[in-house]
């Protein structure tokens, strides 16, 4: 849409002003409820609405947005069901997460929204995976991932920017620099004066934007979207300010009063209103009418939500939400043709057959392309399946696993290879806090398989020989597989690739070339969680 103050009709400008004002009016009501003891917590985005609303308005509805906890305006601009949204924010039955959360740790696939986890910058690699899926399918869409200034010091920020640049992904990295972490000023945590300067280090444009000017935000995002679609990623730094506490309980005593007052004078809604009135595209009376209309709607909706029951659940319901339903296994026929093969051959055969059967299967990891992986499991794959489906990654275990999540959200079947299982420790956050919780939080199937060569016995030393499968076996939401025979390796890997849940597939390096056994030549799957009786 055109810049709002250049819109052709008063109706256009009024609709935009309503979109800009709505999150403010909702927040004002929530803060009132908080003071009354009728709401337990709130993370305010007051003063930052221009970024959330401006970005969401400028992007196409088909584009992915990965917002943060202060971006209520993204959800309202994407026209999320208001009754469910209010139930979510107020912890009542009818919310999006069944009471497991009362903020934005969920996604809405129908709105192309992917919510955050609390670990800063963790969703940026996910945006890379979404971008790769869009590129793989040759879709004219982008992914826009929000991040705070503090989050730009996290490793996931740098891993994601590097991956997006190396792969030329259609991703916009949008940083809200609001001056503070929790209480630490940005200049005590971030070395460069402009975070946008990081773009040059990753061969992408880095643009500083006045985040309190909604027209500037829309213009920057519109241009970034065009660049991302045609040439690759863009880094936008939106300069703004957090005029309230990190959350309401912490207050703002650590912020100089004059600094808060200075930024209140730059309030984005007031700035737009003044410009719209000066340009004659929207009268003050019309703006007052919009506010009155919104306040009445919010009051009515809030009172309705307060009459809804508190969230209740049962242990059975909670356990039942951890995993998506798995397909039934298809074991081999008793008289199936078999071949005597090594353990590694069985793994390779399972992966190759799956890629032949299903174009959605994508393999990525360090050295997996022409080199074929350190243990040569993917040897010859790039020649058969091409670089779009067999992709080398940088040394970014966290970034690669997060990208796998993004690919899975978009319906692809990623297989992420760890060079050695020892290095999976660098990706634990993505595995335990992101992959493992996604279905529980918002019902999204996450069919990601992480292959990891593990164990000792080959003289590889202390950092290439560890066995850490027990770490993950204690994590709800993960399926952990450790095959012992070639037959099991092939069948269980095919099962993993058909799973709508994250699977950690540990392959013992000592077994790769030292164990042989009969393996059915055709495709088959074996059930998870059922012991095979080898001897009696």
Where are these regions (language model features)?
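Cofactor-binding active-site loop characterized by glycine-rich and histidine/acidic residues
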Residues: 25-167, 185-191, 196, 201-203, ...
């Amino acid at each position: 849409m055109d810049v709002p103050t250049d819109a052709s009709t008063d109706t256009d400008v009024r609709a935009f002003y309503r979109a800009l004002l709505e999150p403010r009016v909702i927040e004002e009501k929530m803060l009132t409820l908080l003071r009354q003891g009728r709401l337990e917590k709130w993370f305010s985005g007051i003063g930052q609405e221009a970024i959330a609303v401006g970005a969401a308005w400028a992007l196409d509805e088909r584009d992915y947005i990965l917002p943060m906890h202060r971006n209520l305006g993204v959800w309202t601009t994407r026209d999320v069901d208001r009754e469910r949204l209010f139930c979510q924010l107020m912890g009542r039955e009818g919310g999006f997460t069944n009471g497991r959360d009362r903020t934005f740790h969920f996604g809405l696939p129908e709105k192309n929204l992917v919510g955050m986890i609390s670990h800063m910058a963790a969703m940026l690699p996910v945006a890379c995976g979404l971008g790769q899926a869009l590129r793989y399918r040759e879709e004219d869409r982008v992914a826009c991932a929000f991040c705070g200034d503090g989050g730009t010091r996290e490793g996931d920020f740098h891993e994601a920017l590097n991956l997006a640049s190396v792969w030329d992904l259609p991703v916009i990295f949008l940083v809200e620099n609001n001056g503070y972490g929790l209480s630490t000023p940005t200049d005590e945590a971030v070395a460069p004066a402009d975070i946008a300067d990081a773009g040059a280090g990753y061969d992408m444009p880095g643009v500083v934007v006045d985040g309190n000017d909604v027209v500037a935000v829309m213009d920057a995002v519109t241009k970034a979207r065009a660049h991302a679609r045609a040439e690759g990623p863009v880094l936008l730094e939106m300069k703004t300010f957090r005029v309230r506490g990190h959350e309401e309980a912490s207050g703002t005593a650590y912020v100089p009063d004059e600094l808060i007052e200075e930024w209140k004078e730059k309030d984005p809604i007031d700035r737009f209103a003044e410009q719209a009135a000066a340009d004659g595209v929207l009268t003050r009376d019309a703006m007052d009418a919009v506010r009155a209309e919104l306040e009445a709607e919010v009051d009515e909706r809030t009172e309705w939500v307060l009459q809804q029951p508190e969230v209740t659940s049962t242990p059975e319901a909670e356990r039942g939400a951890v995993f998506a339903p798995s397909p039934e296994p298809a074991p081999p026929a008793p008289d199936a043709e078999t071949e005597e093969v090594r353990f590694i051959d069985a793994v390779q055969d399972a992966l190759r057959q799956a890629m032949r059967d299903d174009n959605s299967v994508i393999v990525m990891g360090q050295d997996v392309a022409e080199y074929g992986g350190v243990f040569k499991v993917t040897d010859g794959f790039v020649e058969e399946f091409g670089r779009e489906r067999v992709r080398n990654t940088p040394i970014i275990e966290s970034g690669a696993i997060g990208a796998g999540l993004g690919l899975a959200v978009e319906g692809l079947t990623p297989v992420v290879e760890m060079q050695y299982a020892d290095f999976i420790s660098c990706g634990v956050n993505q595995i335990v806090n992101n992959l493992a919780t996604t279905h529980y939080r918002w019902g999204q199937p996450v069919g990601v398989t992480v292959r990891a060569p593990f164990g000792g016995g080959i003289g590889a030393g202390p950092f290439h020989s560890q066995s850490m499968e027990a770490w993950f076996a204690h994590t709800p939401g993960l399926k952990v597989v450790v095959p012992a025979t070639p037959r099991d390796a092939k069948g269980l890997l095919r099962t993993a690739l058909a799973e709508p849940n994250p699977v950690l597939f540990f392959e013992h390096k000592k077994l790769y070339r030292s164990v042989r056994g009969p393996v059915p030549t055709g495709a088959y799957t074996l059930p998870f969680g059922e012991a095979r009786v080898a001897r009696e």
